[in-house]
Every structure is written in structure tokens, then in C-alpha cells.
Regions:
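Metal-dependent active-site segment of extracytoplasmic phospho-/sulfohydrolases and closely related
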Residues: 1, 208-229
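N-terminal catalytic scaffold of extracellular/periplasmic and nuclease hydrolases
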Residues: 1-119, 124-137, 144
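The substrate-binding groove and active-site-proximal loops of carbohydrate-active enzymes
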Residues: 46, 155-159
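Surface-exposed acidic, glycine-flexible loop patches that form ligand/cofactor-binding
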Residues: 58-61, 101, 138, 172-178, ...
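Hydrophobic anchor at the start of a short beta-strand
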Residues: 69, 182, 227-229
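Active-site His/acidic residue clusters
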Residues: 80-85, 152-155, 177-181, 185-216
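Phosphate/oxyanion-binding active-site loops and adjacent basic polyanion-contact surfaces
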Residues: 91, 160-168, 206-210
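Active-site regions of oxyanion-processing enzymes, predominantly non-cytosolic
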Residues: 137-149, 167-189
């Protein structure tokens, strides 16, 4: 990197206590549930309270107010962080169940990996299904919801696969043209995975993509003046 990180140029920084309801350290499911619903829960739970009662997510609340919602992840779209926006289940690892919940959720666009957890033949009636990077160059109307599944699980970083930045910009452009208000969550999922693997080079490459995504989001917000990042 030969420049200051774009994420470091965001003027406000906050801190949070990330312990989950039942543990001194959280996992992704409990953490994502906390910011998606406003409530702490047990590790492994997705948008359920500790007694397994359903918690409304920010996507579900905004849907009632007429907002469009989307998510982007370089992991599977059924992974814990994106799943906390739409799934209600007591195990983050029930990927096929979570995939079914996504298909029946308020999410209008979901882009990421996770193709192995979906029956593509069954979802064609309700969703535009994208599986190739080139499809992000196309325009789609709002007659169907849209799901992009660009790898079997997490998206391999290669020239044949879309980056977080490319997927995020696709959603921004689509929403900006065709809806009056929207919510978007975008996750650089594999920064974390590279950390688990002690792979510094991969972590840097993944973070570069994440940081360029942040740059584009900052530019969008500054030009739009009606969007909160």
C-alpha cells in the first residue's frame, strides 16, 4: 500500500463491548445478531434471543417502512454475518436451512458465494440467479429479487470471480437507479479467514479490496448527501 487507508479517513470512530450473552468472547453469529437486532444472544444463534424467541432484524424493520435491502459477502451468503440479517435459527451451521430462509426473506439482492447450499432450479422462478462475474455488467429490473452465487462456498480470489468492490458497486448502482431508500451490508469476509490461517499476504490482498470498497462507499455518500455509511 502506498497511501493512507481510506477506512482511516472516516472521521468518527467508536468502540463496543463484544462479549456475547453467554461467553466472554463472541462468535460471528452472536456479534452479527447484536448489530442486526440490537440484542445480545448466545454464540451460534442467529437473530434469536437466548430463549430462542425471534428478534426482528434491521432488514425486516426497514422492509416494513418500504426500504430495499441487499447484502454482499466474499463468504457464502449463508455465513453467519450476512445470515444474521435474515435468518432465525439456533445454529449458524445449518447452511441449507439458512439458504431456504434467505429465499423467503426481505433481502432483495444477495451477492456472494454458497452455491452448494441452494437448489438453483427451484429459485429461478422468484430470483434472477447470477453465477458468472460478467453478469454484473447487466441491468435487471425489480420484477424479481436477485441472488448472485459466484462460488460453491467462499469466493476464490481470482480474475474469474467478482471482488467485494465489484459486487458492492453493482448493488449501489442497481439500488440508486431503482429505489428511493435502501440498506446495504457489505462484508470483506476473508480478511478474517486469512487471519485464522496466519496468511499475511492473503490478508493484505483481501484488505486492499475491502479498503477500495470503503473508498467507493465514501464517494457515493459524499455525492448523494442522503445516505449514511
Amino acid at each position: 500500500l502506498d497511501h493512507r487507508l481510506f477506512i482511516d479517513q472516516i472521521p468518527y470512530v467508536g468502540t463496543s463491548l463484544t462479549h456475547s450473552y453467554n461467553n466472554a468472547y463472541t462468535d460471528s453469529a452472536a456479534a452479527a445478531t447484536a448489530w442486526s437486532t440490537g440484542y445480545k444472544t448466545k454464540n451460534r444463534y442467529l437473530s434469536l434471543d437466548p430463549d430462542k424467541k425471534i428478534l426482528d432484524t434491521i432488514v425486516e424493520m426497514l422492509h416494513k417502512k418500504g426500504y430495499t435491502s441487499g447484502l454482499v459477502a466474499t463468504s457464502s451468503v449463508t455465513h453467519a454475518t450476512p445470515a444474521a440479517l435474515y435468518a432465525h435459527i439456533d445454529s449458524r451451521y445449518e447452511y441449507k436451512n439458512i439458504a431456504n430462509q434467505l429465499m423467503n426473506s426481505s433481502i432483495d439482492i444477495a451477492l456472494g458465494g454458497g452455491k452448494e447450499f441452494f437448489d438453483l432450479n427451484k429459485i429461478n422462478d422468484t430470483h434472477y440467479v447470477l453465477t458468472e462475474k460478467e453478469s454484473l455488467q447487466l441491468n435487471f429490473d425489480h420484477s424479481k429479487k436477485l441472488i448472485g452465487l459466484f462460488d460453491d462456498d467462499g469466493i476464490e480470489r481470482s480474475n474469474e470471480k467478482p471482488t467485494q468492490r465489484q459486487m458492492t458497486n453493482f448493488v449501489l448502482n442497481h439500488f440508486n437507479k431503482q429505489c428511493s431508500g435502501f440498506f446495504l451490508m457489505t462484508e470483506g469476509s476473508q480478511i478474517d479467514w486469512a487471519g485464522h490461517d496466519n496468511d499475511a499476504n492473503e490478508m493484505i490482498e483481501e484488505f486492499k479490496d475491502f479498503d477500495l470498497t470503503i473508498r467507493d462507499l465514501i464517494n457515493f455518500v459524499n455525492e448523494d448527501n442522503e445516505t449514511l455509511l
